[in-house]
């Protein structure tokens, strides 16, 4: 595995992802703890990705990082974010281009 840590969830997830795509890409989620701004887009990480929120909240606590959440409905992540953007379905592409 490309990352220095693993769990039963990540090991199984990475194995399935690699089987489907041929390779694992992306960044190490632990890098979020070193960020000044964490953007969580299109997922309710508070309720479904505890590992993501652990690193995001660590960045907030240790570095004063801001958390921005983007989704099409209000959820736990939007509620905990410093800035929560609730978009109409299909409009997030325009936001991505504008950023």
For each predicted feature, which ranges?
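Catalytic alpha/large subunits of respiratory electron-transfer oxidoreductases
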Residues: 1-98
């Amino acid at each position: 595995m490309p990352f220095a840590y693993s769990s039963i969830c990540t090991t199984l997830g990475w194995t399935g992802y690699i089987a489907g795509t041929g390779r694992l890409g992306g960044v190490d989620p632990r890098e979020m703890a070193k960020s000044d701004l964490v953007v969580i887009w299109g997922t309710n990480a508070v309720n479904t990705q505890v590992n993501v929120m652990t690193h995001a909240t660590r960045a907030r606590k240790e570095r004063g990082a801001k958390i921005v959440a983007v989704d099409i409905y209000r959820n736990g992540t939007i509620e905990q974010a410093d800035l929560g953007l609730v978009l109409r379905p299909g409009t997030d592409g325009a936001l991505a281009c504008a950023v």
